[in-house]
């Protein structure tokens, strides 16, 4: 599961050069099991994963968002036997690090403090969603995705946020969706249902590294929909 959604095992030079330059000649005094063999990964994959995680950990430590690392729950971030390394007795994953980096980038784009409603396109495993809701408990959150990701993130968030009301609304028609979408803390819908949303304006919409997987005509439809139903739109693209 982890290899499909959020574990990066193929590294190119341009993926790590800036991160290594930022660290420079740091001498580590941390307690870390850097040569751990990960379950479901080969020794080569484990070596790459462990070192990349440690590299990004050092970069994360220089950022303000680092102080929130321990707020992230292992219930979600280690829910599928995800690979991790122990650093100073903390379970550290690429998933946690990337979620914090994404959170900081979004918050720098437009502050979460004045947001009440969020729409996320292509939430995948739900890693970014979990971070955002962990730090902003009062948000109303809608996830728009396709199976199997839709159900993977649903299961994850249901396990992490047991006190929140969560609705699977993917099979509702236009009238039903508009009458029910405001009844839940977290709602799950399908892409075609974006056309159904009429009397709702999201404070912020986000799309993390998923737009490049869409067809050009679908990208045009997405941007048209977002311009109608959202005040802000943050997106990032992993590759051109």
Segments (PLM) and residue ranges:
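Conserved Class I S-adenosyl-L-methionine-dependent methyltransferase catalytic core
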Residues: 1-113
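Conserved beta-strand signature within the Rossmann-like core of class I S-adenosyl-L-methionine
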Residues: 230-240
């Amino acid at each position: 599961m982890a290899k499909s959604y959020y574990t990066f095992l193929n590294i190119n030079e341009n993926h790590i050069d800036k991160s290594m330059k930022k660290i420079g000649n740091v001498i580590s005094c941390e307690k870390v099991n850097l040569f751990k063999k990960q379950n479901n990964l080969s020794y080569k994959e484990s070596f790459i994963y462990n070192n990349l995680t440690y590299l990004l950990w050092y970069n994360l430590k220089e950022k303000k968002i680092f102080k929130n690392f321990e707020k992230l729950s292992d219930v979600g971030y280690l829910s599928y036997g995800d690979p991790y390394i122990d650093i100073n007795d903390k379970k550290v994953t690429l998933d946690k690090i990337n979620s914090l980096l994404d959170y900081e980038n979004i918050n720098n784009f437009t502050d979460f403090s004045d947001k009440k409603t969020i729409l996320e396109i292509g939430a995948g495993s739900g890693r970014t969603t979990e971070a955002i809701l962990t730090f902003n408990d009062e948000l109303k959150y809608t996830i728009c995705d396709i199976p199997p990701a839709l159900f993977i993130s649903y299961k994850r968030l249901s396990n992490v946020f047991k006190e929140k009301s969560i609705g699977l609304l993917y099979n509702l028609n236009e009238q039903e969706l508009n009458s029910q979408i405001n009844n839940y803390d977290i709602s799950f819908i399908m892409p075609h249902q974006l056309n159904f949303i009429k009397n709702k304006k999201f404070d912020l919409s986000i799309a993390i590294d998923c737009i490049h997987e869409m067809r050009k005509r679908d990208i045009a439809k997405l941007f048209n929909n977002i311009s109608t139903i959202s005040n802000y739109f943050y997106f990032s693209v992993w590759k051109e």
